[in-house]
Amino acid sequence: MEKYHVLEMIGEGSFGRVYKGRRKYSAQVVALKFIPKLGRSEKELRNLQREIEIMRGLRHPNIVHMLDSFETDKEVVVVTDYAEGELFQILEDDGKLPEDQVQAIAAQLVSALYYLHSHRILHRDMKPQNILLAKGGGIKLCDFGFARAMSTNTMVLTSIKGTPLYMSPELVEERPYDHTADLWSVGCILYELAVGTPPFYATSIFQLVSLILKDPVRWPSTISPCFKNFLQGLLTKDPRQRLSWPDLLYHPFIAGHVTIITEPAGPDLGTPFTSRLPPELQVLKDEQAHRLAPKGNQSRILTQAYKRMAEEAMQKKHQNTGPALEQEDKTSKVAPGTAPLPRLGATPQESSLLAGILASELKSSWAKSGTGEVPSAPRENRTTPDCERAFPEERPEVLGQRSTDVVDLENEEPDSDNEWQHLLETTEPVPIQLKAPLTLLCNPDFCQRIQSQLHEAGGQILKGILEGASHILPAFRVLSSLLSSCSDSVALYSFCREAGLPGLLLSLLRHSQESNSLQQQSWYGTFLQDLMAVIQAYFACTFNLERSQTSDSLQVFQEAANLFLDLLGKLLAQPDDSEQTLRRDSLMCFTVLCEAMDGNSRAISKAFYSSLLTTQQVVLDGLLHGLTVPQLPVHTPQGAPQVSQPLREQSEDIPGAISSALAAICTAPVGLPDCWDAKEQVCWHLANQLTEDSSQLRPSLISGLQHPILCLHLLKVLYSCCLVSEGLCRLLGQEPLALESLFMLIQGKVKVVDWEESTEVTLYFLSLLVFRLQNLPCGMEKLGSDVATLFTHSHVVSLVSAAACLLGQLGQQGVTFDLQPMEWMAAATHALSAPAEVRLTPPGSCGFYDGLLILLLQLLTEQGKASLIRDMSSSEMWTVLWHRFSMVLRLPEEASAQEGELSLSSPPSPEPDWTLISPQGMAALLSLAMATFTQEPQLCLSCLSQHGSILMSILKHLLCPSFLNQLRQAPHGSEFLPVVVLSVCQLLCFPFALDMDADLLIGVLADLRDSEVAAHLLQVCCYHLPLMQVELPISLLTRLALMDPTSLNQFVNTVSASPRTIVSFLSVALLSDQPLLTSDLLSLLAHTARVLSPSHLSFIQELLAGSDESYRPLRSLLGHPENSVRAHTYRLLGHLLQHSMALRGALQSQSGLLSLLLLGLGDKDPVVRCSASFAVGNAAYQAGPLGPALAAAVPSMTQLLGDPQAGIRRNVASALGNLGPEGLGEELLQCEVPQRLLEMACGDPQPNVKEAALIALRSLQQEPGIHQVLVSLGASEKLSLLSLGNQSLPHSSPRPASAKHCRKLIHLLRPAHSM
């Protein structure tokens, strides 16, 4: 503080105080912001530090400059530029500004925001109060308390920051947001400057949120078209369509007026917000936004407010009612828990409620807000507080609304229709009524009032009394609106349970169907229509879903569904429903019920749909024939309800409702295989009826394919039935009218309500026909160009994927279509980059992208298209493809999320998204990679060796046991699992098959080692692949183990973890009829025996001995017809015999086993002889009891001393040397072994053979007889000449290793030493 003079306080807020000051010894006027540290949490202090760090690096003429910051014992002091005032003061004084001044301010705000966004900084609290006025009329942006500097790994945020009046729609809905939220706020500020009020203003947070989300902006006539267009771009509710960078800079309203500050290149901050994201990053951003999207549809802002209001209402209720009413409430409440559905005849509960519990509040709070105009915003306390400070739980406040404490409960009048109308208005889901629904739910008196009204008025209705209908209809409408408007499923279900819903409703419906006198009343139709609306709203509630937080609601839902299904047949057969409204409403309610069933547990949905084939089959057949009987004279099954009017005399509502209900029964929701299991039998039943020779149902449904309203629903019905019935596919493939209708839909010649979805279903339908029939229905070959046009020119991702699926099927049948490479690559890139909206399960349990991947594979593997692979591998599509696959697999990423945001890191998901890419699609994608890398092998090296390679991460993940278990359980997963595994192994073999830089290869090995790929390969072979397909994984495993010691340890540790299972697999694999597999395994085992200690080798001994320890496996391997197998077996024995006493004992005790070992010495194959001589040599070393048995091998080994293979000569020399100390000197002398070894030592051309011979002679000369022979042969003289030859070598040449052994042997042969 010694640097500044503090002059006067100029502002005060929750943060602290702001003083005007002056820097000592200068005329510089500054603002000093004193922020107390006392009482602030660690989080608040961290946020303050972050704000200071952000401001410290900002240098822009339109952003307040932080000059200094420091701390005292009690405060943090921030020193900034001194501003002349706030922009908000101008609004206070002048109301609004001329457009030219707004234009100048707009250019400066955009300039400041461009600077922040180019540095990846979000302000997150743009409002007039945070815009200061500088000297000369300029503006400066300040208050960076909510600002966030986003790292390169951060794509979107979700934490609620800012002031509600200026919050964007995605922010108030708590959806992930990005920098475009700041741009929305700029639009609000500029609108307020020009008009005098914000574009959305309300004194209630509930009303404000609704306005922001739903209401259009009202445009005064005084705004110029250019300015209006500018604001329209900024105030676009969809952030993806909002005017943003870089287009914002070039808008005519500010073009040429924006100052762009250029700075020297600094550290790489990632892609600035002012530039368009590359496709691969856009894919990541979309995926992250999808992952972090809220699971419910309730904003946290409103949730907190609802909670406050509920607490407030209960608190005031207790204050005003006193102990007596509290006691009465306790005795009148329904006991919690799940009780049997209440019947209408039950005795009504006593109720102390008086009318108008909430009517007074309604009148005082909402009636005055009923005008459609935006109220002028009073300047005092006009802005809602910041959201983080708006709802402090410890200080609940009333948002200007009256509550139940102002109602005189003791002097209320009885119920009136007018009061129910007020309640209806209260629960209507219109912008100004967001508060009341939860208020009603939290009021127990309202719940009892509803229950009482239903009981009392319901009893009157059943007696045909008009007064009962007049009382119950308003209650119905209030209930319907309440069930539709409230999103708090827990509170809503609790209310329904307490009020006796849906039991009372369904009881009313049942009794009304049994009362003939009631059905004669003139008001009966209106009563049923409103009752059906309430039941439909109940079935649509989210607490009926399996994912609901309400545990006992599912049982109530199941009972209600069964009751409704019991009544549906009668409802559809009502004789006096001349207006068709009851049938329509019943069908709509049934459709909603089916949709709720689809999201439920397998047990509940299966029971429901199964009943349509048993006890409720009359409903199912009635629906099917109700659509077709009026048109054609068909036979209706006995008992099936009939629609009483011909279809041609009905409105379009009934056939539309019937077809919609049939589609709801048949169509399986995406990603819910359990639901399809339940519906499959229903589709079988319908398909069987459609395939009957005498049935006219099929032609009737086909004729509806060209009807604007029926088309989409009937397409779904026929498609679902064809999924289960090949016979129906054949019949439809031969129906000219069906094919013509489908072709016309593709060509856009049929006017339908939803062309996009209808076309998508048609494309999949035709794909299914080709797939099932394995040939082209007549005329389909002409569709190639139409479908290709849809694929390359549609911007709807689901259409692109569906068109690709059909093109792939057509291509397999030989249909040609003209696709330009640049066009189909662009189409594929768009489809893989944009968010996927999966509306229908493709045929064959395929994923959303499967058809696209199969088509790409076809296009790239056509003959003469090799150049396309090069173009594709260098395009954006290649990168986007692997990013999309990574997201489908839900791979974990490497950064951490903070403060409610989502970065590139995300916890790994337990299950891949099979709805996007199925096992078949994965196989196609890996085949595409194989084709690409075969053509462009260097691309493979760069993809796999690059640090953090997404492709390498994918390949490693595909070998993980957890993923393979998921793959095996996926639809058709077990079928494609071997293809996936083998493709991955082929791709991982590329670096070892190519000439790769040593450092890069080391990196690849380290990557595979760190992910325990060696262990995973062994587990894959053992648990997931048939024996005939393990050859390639074992080969890769062997390569890894031979090159990397850690991978070898992983192999051994995996065996130790599950010895019984894995040893069993290895035993079978060793004795398989696949020589390459057996050879690789033997090589792996031999390397293990050579490198690791004896404690790790017991499993190898077990493998060779067999379960009965007869060494049958070893005998089989030693006698194997393949040379490579025998050679690797001898090599393995050679390494084992260095350590294993058990194997030495077996050679001695097991009959014929040693003979098999020695038989290898005479093998025709030199490699086998070499390995056999190595094994015999190690058997001879310290042979002990085995020594005499090896005497029979001396002649053979002596003969091999003349073998042309140097390795064999070396091994045999060593073996013979090992036999000397074992008491076989006589046999060695008989075969003239000393003479032969001496000749080798002096004359063999290979130095290593000479060395082995000299070492053998040193060992043998210890036998007196052999020593004497060597002396008699003049060995010393001969060896001396050899030694002299070594000494004559130039000094620069290294001395051979044999020289040392030669000198020592000469010394040992001297007479003095001999004595």
UniProtKB/Swiss-Prot annotation:
Its EC number is 2.7.11.1. GO terms for cellular component: cell projection; cytoplasm; cytoskeleton; cytosol; extracellular region; nucleus. Residues 4-254 form the Protein kinase domain. Its cofactor is Mg(2+). InterPro entries: ARM-like, ARM-type_fold, Kinase-like_dom_sf, Prot_kinase_dom, Protein_kinase_ATP_BS, Ser/Thr_kinase_AS. Changing S767Y: In an ovarian papillary serous adenocarcinoma sample; somatic mutation. PROSITE patterns: PROTEIN_KINASE_ATP, PROTEIN_KINASE_DOM, PROTEIN_KINASE_ST. The keyword Protein biosynthesis does not apply. It catalyses: L-seryl-[protein] + ATP = O-phospho-L-seryl-[protein] + ADP + H(+); L-threonyl-[protein] + ATP = O-phospho-L-threonyl-[protein] + ADP + H(+). SUPFAM superfamilies: ARM repeat, Protein kinase-like (PK-like). It is an enzyme of class 2 (transferase). Its main location: cytoplasm. Expressed at low levels in most fetal tissues, adult ovaries and at high levels in adult testis, where it is localized in germ cells. Expressed in respiratory epithelial cells of the lung. GO terms for molecular function: ATP binding; metal ion binding; protein serine kinase activity; protein serine/threonine kinase activity; transcription corepressor binding. ATP binds at I10, G11, E12, G13, S14, F15, G16, R17, V18, K33. One of its GO terms (biological process) is regulation of DNA-binding transcription factor activity. Belongs to the protein kinase superfamily. Ser/Thr protein kinase family. Interacts with GLI1, GLI2 and GLI3. Interacts with SPAG16 and KIF27. This is Serine/threonine-protein kinase 36. It comes from Homo sapiens.
